[in-house]
Amino acid sequence: MRRYKKYIALILTFIILVTNFTACKAADNTRGTGAENPLEAKDIPDNEAMLFVEELKIGWNLGNTFDAIDNNSLTDELEYERAWNGSYTTEEMIDAVKEAGFNTVRIPVSWHNHLTDDDYTVSEAWMDRVNEVVDWCINRDLYVILNIHHDNSTEYLYPSEEYAEQSIKYITAIWTQLAERYKEYDEHLIFEAMNEPRLVGHENEWWINPDNEDCIEAIACINRYNQVFVDLIRNSGGNNANRYLMCPGYAASSDGALNEGFKLPTDTVEHRLIVSVHAYTPYNFALEAAGTDTWSMENQSDINNMVGFMDKLYDKFITKGIPVVIGEFGARNKYNNNEARTEFAAYYVEAARARGMTCCWWDNNAFIGKGENFGLLNRVSCKWQYPEIVEAMMTHVE
C-alpha cells in the first residue's frame, strides 16, 4: 500500500509539474493577455487594397513642418516650414527615415495660410516646396500620404450644415489643384481627404457623443465631404482614376470610424479606399500630460485598451476587405520613460500588423520641455534620438 501511495505521489507530482510548465508557456505565448493571444495574426482578406496597405509597412510623420499655422511674424511664407520645429526638411532627413526601415512618409500640410486669392489658389512657392519634398520621398521608393491638415475652422473646413457649403468650396478648390499637379504620379502617392475633421471649440470637439445632435450632424457632413473628395479625385484624370484615397471619420478617431453613422464614400473603382484613423491609445499613457508614464504588456488593462479598438476596427472593416491605416500614433516622452515607450511601440505595431493595419508614428521633432514630445529623429544631426524605439517597431514590420 505504501508503495502504491509512493507511485501515486510521484505521478501527481509529475502532473503538477507538467501543468505548471504548460501554464507558464501559455502565459509566455500570450504575453500577459489571458487565453487569447492578441498578437496572433488574424485572417486578413487578400484583395488588392489590403495587400497595398501591407506594403506600406510602417510610416513616419513629417510633423510640425508643412502643417504649421498661426505665425503672423513671418516675412516669408516658406519660413512656416520651420516655424514649429526649427528646421527645414532636407534630403538627409529623408535618407535617415528610409535607412531606418520606414516605408511610408505622411506629409501633413496646411494650405489656408498660403492662399493668394478668394478662390483659394495656393501660392506657387508653397506648392513647389511641398512638391519638392514629396519627390524626395518618392524618388527613394517611399510611399507618401498627402493631406489637408490644420484647416479646421469655420472659414475653411468645418463639419456643420451652417458651414457645409463653405467647406465643400474649400475642399474642392484645394483638392482640384493637388489632383491636377499630381495626376501622373503613381500609387506611391496617397491622398488623405482631411485631418481630424471635428467641431472645433465644441464641448465634443475631441470626444464624440453619438447622441448629441451636433455630433450626428457633423458625422453626416464628414460623409459628404469625403464623397466630394473621392468624386473630385476620380474625375480629375491621369492616375487619379485609381489612386488610393484615405477617408477619416469624426476627428479621425477610432470612435468616429466605428460610429454607425460613418459611411465610406461610394467609388467608381473597387478596393481603393482606406479608412484613416488616429489613435494615441491608451490615452493616459500615450498623450495625456497628467497621465501615467508606465506601460507594460504584463498589465492586462494596458493590453486591453490598445487591442480593444484595433479588434473593433478589424471586425468592422478588415474582415470586409476594407483597409485601415493608423495615420498617427505614438507615445510622448514623459520623464525619459523610454523603456515603457519602447515596449509600447513594439506591441502596438505588432498588434496592428496582426490585424492587417499599418501605423505611422507622429514625429513632431519635439524633445524637451513638458509638451507633446513625440520626436524620434533629430532633424539637425539626422540621427535617431531614441533608436531603441525605432528598432523595436521595425522588429514587427515584416
Each predicted region: which residue ranges?
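N-terminal carbohydrate-binding accessory modules
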Residues: 29-104, 316
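Bacterial N-terminal signal peptides that target proteins for export
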Residues: 1-11
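Active-site region of glycoside hydrolase catalytic domains
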Residues: 165-300, 311-331, 354-357
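Aromatic-rich peripheral "rim/lid" segments of glycoside hydrolase catalytic domains that contact
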Residues: 336-398
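An active-site-proximal structural segment forming one wall of the substrate-binding cleft
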Residues: 85-104, 119-148, 157-193, 222-234
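Acidic/histidine-rich helix-loop elements
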Residues: 63-89, 117-122, 163, 284-306
